[in-house]
C-alpha cells in the first residue's frame, strides 16, 4: 500500500504555501486524488481504497483553515465510498475517483466564471475597488467588469507577511487594469477614495462570518466606517459544513520566520514572541453581500447554501476515516 510521490509533492506544496489560494488548493487536492487513482499499483479493490484514504488523509492534514481542501476531498471520496460500498471492482472504483476529481475541477473553474458575471453587475463605471491578498474569485469580478468596458482602478494591499498582494497586483495589471499598490496599514487612509471592497474567502461559516487572510477583518471594518460596500467572492465549496454543528474554525498559526528572518530572530531577546496567524474572522455585519456561483446572497443566507450543498456531508464520517 503506497501513496504515489506526486501526491506527497502536492501535499508538501500546499503545506508550505507554494500552492496557495483556497480555490487552487481545492483543485490541487482533487487533482492529487486523480493522480493517486491513475498511478496506483494496487492489485485489488480493497488495497486501492486503502491507498485512496491514506492519500486523502495526508492532503487533509496540510492546512487546517481553508475548508475548500476538505470539501474537495469529500466531493471525490464520498463518491468513491458509495461505489466501494456498492461492490465496485478495482477498475470501476478507479474510474469513479478519476471522474469525480475531473468533475470537481471543472465545476470549480466554471464557478469562477459565474462569480465574475454576477459580481461585475455590482461594479459601476468609474469605481475604485480595494482588494486584499490573492483571490481568483475576487479577481474574476474585477476582470469581468473591466472586460465589460467599465473604467475601474484597483487598490491592492501588500498582504504581509507572504506578500500575496504582489501576485494580485501583477495579475490585474496584466489585464490592463490600473493598480495602486499600498502597504496594509494604508488601507484606512485610502478608504476615503474607495467605492467598493472586493475580497475572497478561505471559509464561510453558518452565520455568514468570513475567514480569510489576516487583515481582511480590519479592511472590512474600515469599509463599514466609511459606508463602503464590502463584497466577498467565494465558491460554494468554501462554505464550512461543520460550523452547522457548532464546530469552530481553527485559525492556522504559521512559522515566526515568515515575519522575521530566522537569522535576525535569533538575535532578539528571548522574552519577545512573534505570533503569525494566517487568517482572521470578519463578522457578518461587516459584509454586505457574498458573491457565489449560485448568485449574490446576504451573509445570513449562508446557512441555506450549507444545507443545500453540504447537508449530506453531516450524515457521514469523513470518507477517509472509516
From Swiss-Prot:
Record's catalysed reaction(s): alpha-D-ribose 1,5-bisphosphate = D-ribulose 1,5-bisphosphate
Gene3D superfamilies from the entry? translation initiation factor eif-2b, domain 1, Translation initiation factor eif-2b, domain 2
Assembly mode = Homohexamer; trimer of dimers.
Starting at the broadest rank, the lineage of the source organism is: Archaea, Methanobacteriati, Methanobacteriota, Thermococci, Thermococcales
Site, Plays a key role in hexamerization: residue positions: 227
Q: Which GO terms describe its molecular function?
A: ribose 1,5-bisphosphate isomerase activity; S-methyl-5-thioribose-1-phosphate isomerase activity
What name does UniProt use for this protein? Ribose 1,5-bisphosphate isomerase
Induction annotation? Up-regulated by nucleosides (at protein level).
Which cysteine pairs are covalently linked by disulfides here?
Answer: none
Please state how the activity of this protein is regulated. Answer: Is highly activated in the presence of AMP, with an increase of >40-fold in activity levels. Among other nucleotides, isomerase activity is slightly increased in the presence of GMP, but CMP, UMP, TMP, and NAD(+) have no effect; therefore, AMP is likely the major activator of R15P isomerase in vivo. To a lesser extent, various compounds with an adenosyl moiety, such as dAMP, adenosine, or methylthioadenosine, can also act as activators. The regulation of this enzyme by AMP prevents excess degradation of intracellular AMP by the archaeal AMP degradation pathway.
Any other noteworthy remark? Reaction proceeds via a cis-phosphoenolate intermediate.
Q: Which UniProt keywords apply?
A: Carbohydrate metabolism, Isomerase
Amino acid at each position: 500500500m503506497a501513496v504515489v510521490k506526486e501526491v506527497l509533492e502536492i501535499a508538501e506544496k500546499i503545506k508550505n504555501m507554494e500552492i496557495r489560494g483556497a480555490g487552487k488548493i481545492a483543485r490541487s487536492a482533487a487533482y492529487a486524488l486523480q493522480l493517486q487513482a491513475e498511478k496506483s499499483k494496487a492489485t485489488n479493490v480493497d488495497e486501492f481504497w486503502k491507498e485512496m484514504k491514506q492519500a486523502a488523509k495526508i492532503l487533509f492534514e496540510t492546512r487546517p483553515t481553508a475548508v475548500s481542501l476538505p470539501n474537495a476531498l469529500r466531493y471525490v471520496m464520498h463518491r468513491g465510498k458509495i461505489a466501494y460500498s456498492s461492490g465496485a471492482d478495482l477498475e470501476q472504483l478507479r474510474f469513479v475517483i478519476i471522474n469525480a476529481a475531473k468533475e470537481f475541477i471543472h465545476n470549480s473553474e466554471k464557478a469562477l466564471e459565474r462569480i465574475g458575471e454576477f459580481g461585475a453587475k455590482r461594479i459601476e463605471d468609474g469605481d475604485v475597488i480595494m482588494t486584499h491578498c490573492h483571490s481568483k474569485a475576487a479577481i474574476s469580478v474585477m476582470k469581468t467588469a473591466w472586460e465589460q468596458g467599465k473604467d475601474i482602478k484597483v487598490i491592492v494591499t501588500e498582504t504581509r507577511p507572504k506578500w500575496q498582494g504582489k501576485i494580485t497586483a501583477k495579475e490585474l495589471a496584466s489585464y490592463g487594469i490600473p493598480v495602486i499598490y499600498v502597504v496594509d496599514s494604508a488601507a484606512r487612509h485610502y478608504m476615503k477614495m474607495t467605492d467598493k471592497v472586493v475580497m475572497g474567502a478561505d471559509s464561510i461559516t453558518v452565520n455568514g462570518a468570513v475567514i480569510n487572510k489576516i487583515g481582511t477583518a480590519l479592511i472590512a471594518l474600515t469599509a463599514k466606517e466609511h459606508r463602503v460596500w464590502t463584497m466577498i467572492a467565494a465558491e460554494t465549496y468554501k462554505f464550512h459544513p461543520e460550523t452547522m454543528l457548532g464546530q469552530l474554525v481553527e485559525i492556522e498559526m504559521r512559522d515566526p520566520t515568515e515575519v522575521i528572518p530566522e537569522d535576525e530572530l535569533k538575535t532578539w531577546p528571548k522574552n519577545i514572541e512573534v505570533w503569525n496567524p494566517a487568517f482572521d474572522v470578519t463578522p457578518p455585519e461587516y459584509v454586505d453581500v457574498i458573491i457565489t456561483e449560485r448568485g449574490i446572497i446576504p451573509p445570513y443566507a449562508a446557512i441555506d447554501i450549507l444545507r443545500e450543498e453540504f447537508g449530506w456531508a453531516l450524515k457521514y464520517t469523513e470518507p477517509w476515516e472509516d
